[in-house]
Amino acid sequence: MAFVASIPAVRIQTSLQSLKGESLKAQKPAAAKQAAFTVVAQAEEKKGRREFVAAAGALFAAFAASPAAFAYSAADANVTGLGGDLSNIDINNANIAVYQKLPGMYPNIAKKIIGGAPYKSVAELYSLDLSEKQKETLRKYEDNFYAGEPVDALGFDSINNGIYK
């Protein structure tokens, strides 16, 4: 409010008045009071936005600085079959990029496998809506797959893990 008091009344204009080109001196006292209130309200709104952005930034910085924010739990770190070894692929937790390394599996069969997870056994893959040619391709790699216990921490990135070539 002290900021508003230090501004000459001639320069304070509301958006409507600036369109008409009228300053506060040319207005009635009640209109001048309303215009001053509008300016104060706008200043308070900007102050509120600045405080919100500052608080949100501080919260984000605290979260981003925390090593636990992006780390999997200790149990998740021991999950195998995520694609490092193509002869041992966990169909419940492997990312779609793993299937790119298996000719004929990507993109159609891979999307169906990931979309239908979790599975109790590899045999459940044949209950997916696959053509005979796709089932033949699946049989080709069947010995490379196993149905591990689904890990919630890995489920969110099964289609796009954010790692690009």
From Swiss-Prot:
Top-rank taxon, per record: Eukaryota
Pfam families: PsbU
Membrane topology reported for the UniProt record: Peripheral membrane protein
Residue range of the transit peptide in the UniProt record, numbered on this chain: 1-45, 46-65
Location in the cell: Plastid, Cyanelle thylakoid membrane
GO cellular component: cyanelle thylakoid membrane; extrinsic component of membrane; photosystem II
PTM annotation, UniProt: Might be translocated into the thylakoid lumen by the Tat system. The position of the transit peptide cleavages have not been experimentally proven.
UniProt-listed InterPro entries: PSII_PsbU
Thylakoid in keyword set: yes
UniProt record, GO biological process: photosynthesis; photosystem II stabilization
Keywords: Cyanelle, Electron transport, Membrane, Photosynthesis, Photosystem II, Plastid, Thylakoid, Transit peptide, Transport
Description of how the protein assembles with itself and partners: PSII is composed of 1 copy each of membrane proteins PsbA, PsbB, PsbC, PsbD, PsbE, PsbF, PsbH, PsbI, PsbJ, PsbK, PsbL, PsbM, PsbT, PsbX, PsbY, PsbZ, Psb30/Ycf12, at least 3 peripheral proteins of the oxygen-evolving complex and a large number of cofactors. It forms dimeric complexes. This protein is not detected by antibodies against green algal PsbU but it is detected by antibodies against red algal PsbU.
Family: Belongs to the PsbU family.
Function recorded in the entry: One of the extrinsic, lumenal subunits of photosystem II (PSII). PSII is a light-driven water plastoquinone oxidoreductase, using light energy to abstract electrons from H(2)O, generating a proton gradient subsequently used for ATP formation. The extrinsic proteins stabilize the structure of photosystem II oxygen-evolving complex (OEC), the ion environment of oxygen evolution and protect the OEC against heat-induced inactivation.
Protein name according to UniProt: Photosystem II extrinsic protein U, cyanelle
Organism: Cyanophora paradoxa
Taxonomic classification: Eukaryota, Glaucocystophyceae, Cyanophoraceae, Cyanophora
